[in-house]
Regions:
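Histidine-anchored nucleotide/phosphate-binding helix
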Residues: 28-38
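Conserved N-terminal subdomain of the carbohydrate kinase-like
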Residues: 12-24, 40-114
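Active-site metal-binding loops of divalent metal-dependent hydrolases
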Residues: 8-10
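Extreme N-terminal starter segment of soluble prokaryotic enzymes
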Residues: 1-5
């Protein structure tokens, strides 16, 4: 049983900074929140991804309950692309593709509903 459930976006982020570029980095509000909160308590995540998603092991390896991640066959995972200058507090959005997140209807897994 999870002490905390994070519901939100699970995404792939493509980031460009003056220091380099990273393609398809695991991102999204539910991911970032889960990774941080998991340092203090048991966390479950609820979100939706396409069948192109391969980031679930990253969360599971850290003990995060991924049973609430819905995988939509034939769909694509939410993706965001942005650029940062030397002020890393300011992001410029270059592209946003909602993919399956556009139709997201959050559902707790049976285990998470306990």
């Amino acid at each position: 049983v999870n002490s905390l459930i994070a519901v939100g976006s699970i995404a792939y982020d493509t980031l460009e900074t003056p220091f380099g570029r990273r393609d398809r980095a695991l991102g999204g509000s539910a991911v970032h929140f889960s990774l941080a909160a998991n340092l203090f308590t048991d966390v479950g995540v609820v979100g939706v991804v396409g069948d192109d998603f391969d980031g679930e092991p990253v969360l599971a390896e850290r003990g995060i309950d991924t049973s609430g991640i819905q995988v939509v066959a034939g769909g694509t995972t939410f993706a965001w692309e942005g650029r940062y200058g030397f002020d890393l507090n300011v992001a410029e959005t270059l592209d946003t593709r909602l993919g399956v997140f556009e139709q997201f209807d959050p559902q707790l897994s049976e285990e998470q509903a306990k």
